[in-house]
Amino acid sequence: MTSLVITDIDGTITGDDRAVHLKCIRYLRELQKRGIPVGIATGNTLCYSRSAATLLGFEGPLIAENGGIVAVDDEEISTVPEEDIELIQEAYRELRRRLGVRRTEPPGLRRTEVAIYRDVPIEEVERVLDGLGYSGRIEVVDTGFAYHLKSKRVDKGKGLLVICERLGIDPDDVVAIGDGDNDAPLLKAAGLGVAPANATENVKRIADVVLDAENGEGVATFLRKLLEEVDA
């Protein structure tokens, strides 16, 4: 029995032009009408996640900042230890000094990680972090839009487990959908992990279902079948 559907946005329920795929939205809203909450899991900020959920009509829990922040109803939970947050800020300052990297947002908008522009090779960022002794606690995740400096102790999958504990949901009853490497832990933690055809090879290896079509086109087909199963 499906108790929750949680999905990434870009490359998952969007089209090639990054506009939301209307069939995906329609099917997800129909699932909600049948009592199955729909949530968002993103590398973006909680502010963005809440706005997107409101615009799309999703009423379920939210995973933001790659699992660093979780929102269940009106409760906001930071999953990252304070010492890791301080270390990430320190690492960013060193990267800015040594490589000239820049934040993608003003300071303070992200609570648990730092997102930087992809102006230098990710290997250079990792080399500096390793040389400074940060690589044991901080990792760099390339979402395709930015490099995210984040704690190794959290990811979207661990964020999902926090949600399941709060809501009393068995993770095996969760459907998770995503395409990027930062979605891999989410799909692994869920009972059913679904990846569109454009997903990275790492995500495809982890997914229980790999769709034939890319982006929202493939996900819409899956959601239609899921809706049919719920109605059966």
Swiss-Prot record:
Q: Which residues does the record give as Mg(2+) binding sites?
A: D8, D10, D179, D183
Give the range the annotation lists for the signal sequence: none
- NCBIfam families hit by this protein: HAD-SF-IIB, Pglycolate_arch, PRK01158.1, SPP-subfamily
Q: Name one GO molecular function term.
A: magnesium ion binding
Q: Which family does it belong to?
A: Belongs to the archaeal SPP-like hydrolase family.
Species this protein is from: Methanopyrus kandleri (strain AV19 / DSM 6324 / JCM 9639 / NBRC 100938)
Protein origin, superkingdom: Archaea
Question: So where does substrate get bound?
Answer: K156
Query: This chain belongs to which protein, by name?
Result: Phosphoglycolate phosphatase
* Cofactor(s) listed: Mg(2+)
| Matching PANTHER family | HAD SUPERFAMILY HYDROLASE-LIKE, TYPE 3, PHOSPHOSERINE PHOSPHATASE
Claim: Magnesium is one of the keywords in the record: yes
> Function, please?
Catalyzes the dephosphorylation of 2-phosphoglycolate.
* SUPFAM superfamilies in the cross-refs: HAD-like (SSF56784)
Q: What is its EC number?
A: 3.1.3.18
GO CC list: cytosol
Active site positions = D8 (nucleophile)
Q: What is catalysed by this protein?
A: 2-phosphoglycolate + H2O = glycolate + phosphate
